[in-house]
Amino acid sequence: MSLQSIKYQRGSLEILDQLLLPVVSKYLTVRGVEDGWKVINKMQVRGAPAIAIVGCLSLAVEIYPEEFGSKKSLRQEIEGKLNYLVSARPTAVNMKISADELITLANELTKDDNVTVEDMKQRFLNATEAMLEKDIADNRAIGANGAKAILEHVAESASAAAAGPVRVLTHCNTGSLATAGYGTALGVVRHLSELGKLEHVYCTETRPYNQGARLTAYELVHEKLPATLVLDSMVAALLRVKNVAAVVVGADRVAANGDTANKIGTYQIAVVAKHHGVPFYVAAPLTSVDLQIPSGDHIIIEVRPDREMTHVGEHRIAAPGINCWNPAFDVTPASLVTGIITEHGVFKPSALKAEITKLLDL
């Protein structure tokens, strides 16, 4: 059974504090937008889909008990608070897209004379709650589409073990802890396991925040999936000797041309995968694709505090006085990406914009 990182019922929101994992499993109460901003910014909740859901639900629990004198005041509250939540971690595009959708809804309801202020509030709450259920359904579709793509690639290869279970590598955390449930890249791993086609999954430690060691390994052990943790610096050796069938990672933002911003270290894994002829897949919902950004050069990369590199907990591990560069993400060029796995199918980066434009009827 997948872990539950987000517990929600109308008027109440709790999140699993991911900074304490894997040693302590503790839920934090999110009482409103300020709490939501803090848990996102401090990375007590992380993963682009989960950030968007927790951000939007934090506003939902804040406005649930409130009474508004007019639709205009409610609209202003929604717009101002959602834009504030976007600033908590700007690289993850899902929060911005979700905010824009909800602001558009609020504007439309404000203009509709047949909608009362209470109706408007209820419809806003319904819309935020629908995001939670949709994310889980989308993740399951991503898992199925990704597993199918990997197995088809293996079947077409010259491998003697083409028909057997596969070995895959993943990076960072893209499972139930990064989404509303099931996961994106880790959802692909889960679906392979459900099909009886997963021989082994390797996960990187993912320095400096160790999301792979702390979170992905925690999920894999919890679900008793066959897994091995490797250091970030071991990936080249791993792909050379362990017959890995595919690499599958998540994404915080995908540009229109297929360039992908994901957890720092993703780019070098893609380079190594290309060298060894291992297909490299990005698993992400359409909400992670930003068609307004032509390429990865336009993606804002969040830079985290030096302390995350120089300390483990309260213990310093780097020489005092050393300079640090700590970007949270890097951008993998589309030329290194085999396919982008979405809830609607697997697309080549070169066809991504056209396919999504057609899907969304833009």
Curated annotation (Swiss-Prot):
Keywords: Amino-acid biosynthesis, Cytoplasm, Isomerase, Methionine biosynthesis, Nucleus
GO biological process: L-methionine salvage from methylthioadenosine
E.C. number: 5.3.1.23
MF-aspect GO terms: S-methyl-5-thioribose-1-phosphate isomerase activity
Record pathway: Amino-acid biosynthesis; L-methionine biosynthesis via salvage pathway; L-methionine from S-methyl-5-thio-alpha-D-ribose 1-phosphate: step 1/6
Site (Transition state stabilizer): 172
Coarse class of the protein's main subcellular location: cytoplasm
Catalytic machinery residues: 252
One GO location term (cellular component): cytoplasm
InterPro entries (alphabetical): IF-2B-related (IPR000649), IF-M1Pi (IPR005251), IF_2B-like_C (IPR042529), Initiation_fac_2B_a/b/d (IPR011559), M1Pi_N (IPR027363), NagB/RpiA_transferase-like (IPR037171)
Family: Belongs to the eIF-2B alpha/beta/delta subunits family. MtnA subfamily.
NCBIfam families linked: eIF-2B_rel, PRK05720.1, salvage_mtnA
Protein name per UniProt: Methylthioribose-1-phosphate isomerase
